[in-house]
């Protein structure tokens, strides 16, 4: 699907607009029209064949993304913040749905994912976080995803990952990209919006989704619902664990310190006990590269989904996403790596 087709998909559907609830009817109509125009331009960033965008200037000397001014990106980010705040921290999602893991800044691979799974609104989606960093097109990626979120707020969901945090994306690329192509001010506005994103999703009450994993502090799902926003990601505690923890085999105890230096690793028995307590069929999380794009754990009661193939140009991994159909049958679609990396042995 090319950019023109993406635009048509977006323009055929109503767009969520927080401004539409304010002012006289004429102002609402004008505001909605501006929304349509902006969303369509967002989708027109690049075609699936484009490997790298070429920054342009907006007449003031400020570098801008192809066809999009800083004011328009800022508008998108602020509207998305309002939408996130209007929805719960634990979003409840109906099947059918596609569940996608880390995508980072690999924009053309995102378009490949939509080619395989169906472009919204032909398919419903929940993404498990990590939209920015470790790629040269984080802005294209996060802006297109936010545009879809605004266009289809009840069928397109974005969870927060550990890279949607200022202390992380300041180091791993997103801050530098915002500064180079727009401004530090825009990066700060992205940070404010990331601080309002939901941290977990529940598909038909049976599949619990998050970016990282479980927490020893999580004893009631209402704890997630009660998290106040906006919030940064603390160094420890429930939010930190939902975004940072990992499953691990061959553990001597149920919980151990994570080698990442933050949060925990948890055992198979933790997963099985948690699912039994909350009557869950599956925990679906992301956060770790896996060769096939997905990998089961704890007798298929947890699955890791990773959707960025050839991650960072350092791995030969495939990407994948999970499809949950109307009958709650689960299957996986792989995003094959486009190149084989050379390995040298000494």
Curated annotation (Swiss-Prot):
Superkingdom: Eukaryota
EC number: 3.1.3.16
Pfam families referenced in this protein's UniProt entry, alphabetically: Metallophos, STPPase_N
Cofactor-binding details, from the entry: Binds 2 manganese ions per subunit.
Entry keyword Metal-binding: yes
Organism: Trypanosoma brucei brucei
UniProt cross-references to SUPFAM superfamilies, sorted A to Z: Metallo-dependent phosphatases (SSF56300)
Active site residues of this protein: 163
Binding site for Mn(2+) 1: 102, 104, 130
Keywords: Hydrolase, Manganese, Metal-binding, Protein phosphatase
Similarity section: Belongs to the PPP phosphatase family. PP-1 subfamily.
InterPro entries: Calcineurin-like_PHP_ApaH, Metallo-depent_PP-like, PP1_catalytic_subunit, Ser/Thr-sp_prot-phosphatase, STPPase_N
Name recorded for this polypeptide: Serine/threonine-protein phosphatase PP1(4.8)
Region (Disordered): 46-65
Miscellaneous section: Trypanosoma brucei contains two PP1 genes which are highly similar.
GO molecular function: metal ion binding; protein serine/threonine phosphatase activity
Cofactor: Mn(2+)
Enzyme class: hydrolase
Cross-referenced SMART domains: PP2Ac
Annotated positions binding Mn(2+) 2: 130, 162, 211, 287
Reactions mediated catalytically: O-phospho-L-seryl-[protein] + H2O = L-seryl-[protein] + phosphate; O-phospho-L-threonyl-[protein] + H2O = L-threonyl-[protein] + phosphate
Cellular component GO terms, alphabetical: cytoplasm; nucleus
């Amino acid at each position: 699907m090319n950019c023109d087709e993406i635009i048509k998909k977006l323009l055929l559907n109503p767009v969520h607009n927080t401004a539409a609830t304010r002012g006289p009817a004429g102002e609402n109509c004008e505001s909605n029209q501006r929304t349509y125009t902006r969303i369509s331009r967002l989708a027109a960033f690049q075609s699936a064949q484009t490997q790298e965008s070429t920054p342009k200037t907006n007449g003031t000397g400020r570098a801008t993304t192809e066809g999009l001014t800083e004011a328009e990106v800022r508008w998108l980010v602020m509207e998305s913040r309002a939408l996130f705040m209007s929805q719960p921290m634990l979003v409840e999602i109906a099947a059918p749905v596609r569940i996608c893991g880390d995508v980072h800044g690999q924009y053309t691979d995102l378009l490949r994912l939509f080619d395989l799974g169906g472009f919204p609104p032909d398919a419903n989606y929940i993404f498990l976080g990590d939209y920015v960093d470790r790629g040269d097109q984080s802005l294209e990626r996060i802006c297109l995803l936010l545009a879809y979120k605004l266009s289809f707020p009840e069928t397109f969901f974005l969870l927060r990952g550990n890279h949607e945090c200022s202390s992380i994306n300041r180091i791993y690329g997103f801050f530098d990209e915002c500064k180079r192509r727009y401004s530090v001010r825009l990066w700060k506005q992205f940070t404010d919006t990331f601080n309002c994103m939901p941290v977990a999703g529940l598909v038909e009450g049976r599949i619990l989704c998050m970016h990282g994993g479980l927490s020893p502090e999580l004893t009631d799902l209402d704890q997630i619902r009660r998290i106040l926003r906006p919030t940064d990601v603390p160094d420890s505690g429930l939010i930190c664990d939902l975004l940072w923890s990992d499953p691990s085999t061959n553990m001597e105890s149920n919980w151990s310190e994570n080698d990442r230096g933050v949060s925990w690793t948890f055992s198979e028995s933790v997963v099985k006990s948690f699912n039994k307590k909350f009557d869950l069929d599956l925990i679906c999380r992301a956060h770790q590269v896996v060769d096939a794009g997905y990998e089961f754990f704890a007798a298929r009661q947890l699955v890791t989904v990773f959707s960025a193939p050839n991650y960072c140009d350092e791995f030969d991994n495939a990407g994948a996403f999970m499809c949950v159909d109307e009958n709650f049958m689960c299957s996986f679609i792989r995003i094959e790596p486009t190149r084989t990396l050379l390995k040298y042995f000494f």
